[in-house]
């Protein structure tokens, strides 16, 4: 069995911009580095990148924007999520040109994660 502290983080990013394969690969690598900030290893990280999404904030469509969900088994330390948020905002701005004030991130912890016919 895997230890709860390390198993199965998931990052799902919905972005308004197109993600060509080369940018997907760079973003995937950076997300792999980012997850280590909250003590999770890339070797258990699942990533879902969804491009060309319509995102709205305050009733207005975002030309460039991102909504990112970080899901973990257990809980992530709040001080570490602050650090990860700063890092992710830098990543989405530098790779995709999405302004940091248009990157929205939520963190979700669960005590139950299913895989391979059973739950952890």
Question: Which residue stretches match the model-derived regions?
Answer:
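Short, Lys/Arg-enriched N-terminal segments with co-localized hydrophobic residues
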Residues: 1-7
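Interaction-mediating elements
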Residues: 8-120
